[in-house]
Amino acid sequence: MKVLIVGAGLAGLTAAEDLVAHGADVTVFEARDRVGGRTHGVEVAPGRWVDAGAAYLGDRHTALHEQITRLGLKTTPTTMTGDSRFLLGKDGETRHGRFPPLSAVALGEMFDLLDELTAAVDPVAPWQTPDAARLDTLTAQVWASEHLRHPDARLFFPLFLGEMMAADPASVSMLHVAFYLRSGGGTRYLNAFEGGAQQDRVDGGAHQLCEQLAAGLDVRLGTEVLGVVSDHAGVTVHTGQDGHRADAVVVAVPPLLADRIDIPGLPHRRAGDDTGRGCTVKVNLVYPQPIWRDHGLSGWSVNAEGPLLSTVDDSPAWGGAGVLTGFVTGAEAHRYGALTEAEQREEAVAQAGRIFPMLPEPVAVHVTDWTSEPYSKGCYAALFGPGDWQRLGQHLTTPHGRIHWAGTETSTEFFGLMEGAIRSGHRAATEIIAEVTNEWSTLR
């Protein structure tokens, strides 16, 4: 059995590994000059790497933990020891824990409303959720204007969506928000560090997962797939002037990229006109050491104004540097991404200094703009706009002939996370193995 994989991220490489284990001859095509997809690392000191892409995981991410253990990698807790900083008004405030200096009653009511929506979502078929048609035509911005009365809730809601989903409330459907939160384990789990989805990091960076998976596979870098043709006998994958024949193919790239592949006869698009890209620019500010810890601070901050809408301590577990990672998300990511490199550095360094006045000049600033990355089309994941779940939902995982789909956007569990990507890869491989097994049984 010959299988081709489009995309060398966690989903594609997981599917490839599973298929090879079942005796398949597998080739992986990757348009970039590296493997990893939306995982990516930057070296901040000799032998010390941190995540410029996907980074965090929790105890419920069982497939990811299994992969980490099997590959001999380790995790380290996300550093949250110390006080947090909040710049939500004219003056900054330092306080213990992560709860912002806003009305606890107002934010509690906001989270209760989100929990009610989340609990009602059909996790397998969100488009069949009660009241799905209305929720899917409603943007998160409109929902907030109708349901959030307190100014503190209205201030915090877009910051929350930016942190959780890299979403601009004006462009994402409320059904998608509810599904995303349900898929990720619920509002509080997805938002939590200790005991939540952001509890740990992979020592040395999550990009190592894909690098180790790829080491034992036939991976063709710099090879963009332009077309896929499925027929009764198999598939042909076109890369430039070359055609590659196989029994099946797994397309494991984000919907906006899959939509660019010419697939004759595909009855439904992989993305809609209103499907957005996760709006994220990740800024790794590198210092000689995590000096904020000496001042009793965790490195965590939440800020009403950009570019850095939140920060976290991502310093390597074994020392060598202090790394403060800033997240530029939502609409702010578009503004910041349009700046020059010098302007981006200047703004990030200046704001980090306002949040943490004890900071020295950084030794390096690494800016990774996922919104403009041509072979990702955003990060953390695609954002479904008004009507997208109604139009696209039931087709996200349905094979088209011998074409199968993977990627975190096709996962009903942990959509948008590394865990979702890995689970989708396992699912796609299982589909192909079952399909071939059934064909062999029929021939007998």
Where are these regions (language model features)?
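Dinucleotide-binding Rossmann-like beta1-alpha1 core, especially the glycine-rich loop
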Residues: 48-120
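Active-site/ligand-binding neighborhood in enzyme catalytic cores
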Residues: 122-227, 232-234, 252, 261-262, ...
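Conserved flavin/dinucleotide-binding core of flavoenzymes
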Residues: 13-14, 22, 97, 234-236, ...
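Glycine-rich FAD pyrophosphate-binding loop
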Residues: 20-45
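Central helical "cap/lid" subdomain
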Residues: 223-224, 229-232, 236-296, 358
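Glycine-rich active-site loop/strand segments that organize a redox cofactor
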Residues: 37-64, 120-129, 178-188
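Generic structural signal for small/hydrophobic residues in well-ordered secondary structure
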Residues: 30, 36, 68, 144, ...
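N-terminal Rossmann-like FAD-binding beta1-loop-alpha1 element of flavoenzymes
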Residues: 2-28
